[in-house]
């Protein structure tokens, strides 16, 4: 919005030309989202407390979590608000990639909101019925994936980028839709599963979004895309603005979500952020890179799958409790230790993922 306005005002004052620079807009996008989150935080927490929108804690969970019962949840609303406002202010409104991310972000946010509403208002610990949750998540993911396939069919936008192999970029055909579906829905659920400790999900999300900001910048620059042997996608550059907005909003939320948390993001935040990371990976053709950089989310999800599978097949559990962060809690690790160590692992994985762009 401001970019469009600046383009009309630059003829009156050349200083408005700074709005055309991607690096400038990326920085102010981050700062805008950060300040909105910090401003909304105390007000959102007070409002949620007044409405008695408190966290529902499982009785079979770690005893250390019982003290979290009643802590305001659905704080993801402030994350989404900060991201959407910042993106609308600083990104080019004509960019289709930006709108793809916003559709998934807002759509998954609405699904998460309904899920949280069932938990905190109707006191239903299971939340929204699973089949309906996955149905609407699938509708959004398949709708966006199908639209992208129709527009980008047989172009670099539907190629698969394989790490370590610079000349291996097969056209996916209709498999593009299926892959995109699993990436978007899978990442949404993976971040949701990871969101079980104070700050555990938001910081890896910030790290991955920051990594994708660099990838988006390179993908949208023909010279760097050719240098790194990745597809050049002319709309990808504006995803830098989206990614930095996620970073800013996430850091602002972390101010209130760090241990001991004053507010939790709830499904409205975790599903939306996960879906956003998934669609960003799809748009940048970096699904494999998401698996590497988002390794913490992958491990958390696999721990649940393995735990359920083992119990059904063998009647035995692999972990003391899943997702795996609860396993370490039950082993006696203090919650802050689990959180910070997972943060460190996440940062290392993002750096490793970025390194794979050059190792080809």
UniProtKB/Swiss-Prot annotation:
The organism's place on the tree of life at top rank: Bacteria
Protein EC: 2.7.8.13
Known cofactor(s): Mg(2+)
Topology in the lipid bilayer: Multi-pass membrane protein
Keywords for the protein's UniProt record, in alphabetical order: Cell cycle, Cell division, Cell inner membrane, Cell membrane, Cell shape, Cell wall biogenesis/degradation, Magnesium, Membrane, Metal-binding, Peptidoglycan synthesis, Transferase, Transmembrane, Transmembrane helix
Reactions performed catalytically: UDP-N-acetyl-alpha-D-muramoyl-L-alanyl-gamma-D-glutamyl-meso-2,6-diaminopimeloyl-D-alanyl-D-alanine + di-trans,octa-cis-undecaprenyl phosphate = di-trans,octa-cis-undecaprenyl diphospho-N-acetyl-alpha-D-muramoyl-L-alanyl-D-glutamyl-meso-2,6-diaminopimeloyl-D-alanyl-D-alanine + UMP
Pathway(s) of this molecule: Cell wall biogenesis; peptidoglycan biosynthesis
GO MF annotation: an example: UDP-N-acetylmuramoyl-L-alanyl-D-glutamyl-meso-2,6-diaminopimelyl-D-alanyl-D-alanine:undecaprenyl-phosphate transferase activity
GO biological process, one term: regulation of cell shape
Pfam families per record: Glycos_transf_4, MraY_sig1
PROSITE patterns noted in UniProt: MRAY_1, MRAY_2
Compartments reported by the entry: Cell inner membrane
GO cellular component terms attached to this protein's record: plasma membrane
Cytoplasmic side, ranges: 47-71, 115-131, 189-198, 257-262, 309-337
Transmembrane parts of this sequence: 26-46, 72-92, 94-114, 132-152, 168-188, 199-219, 236-256, 263-283, 288-308, 338-358
Periplasmic compartment residues: 1-25, 93, 153-167, 220-235, 284-287, 359-360
Annotated function: Catalyzes the initial step of the lipid cycle reactions in the biosynthesis of the cell wall peptidoglycan: transfers peptidoglycan precursor phospho-MurNAc-pentapeptide from UDP-MurNAc-pentapeptide onto the lipid carrier undecaprenyl phosphate, yielding undecaprenyl-pyrophosphoryl-MurNAc-pentapeptide, known as lipid I.
HAMAP family: MraY (MF_00038)
Family: Belongs to the glycosyltransferase 4 family. MraY subfamily.
Protein name listed in UniProt: Phospho-N-acetylmuramoyl-pentapeptide-transferase
Organism: Salmonella paratyphi A (strain AKU_12601)
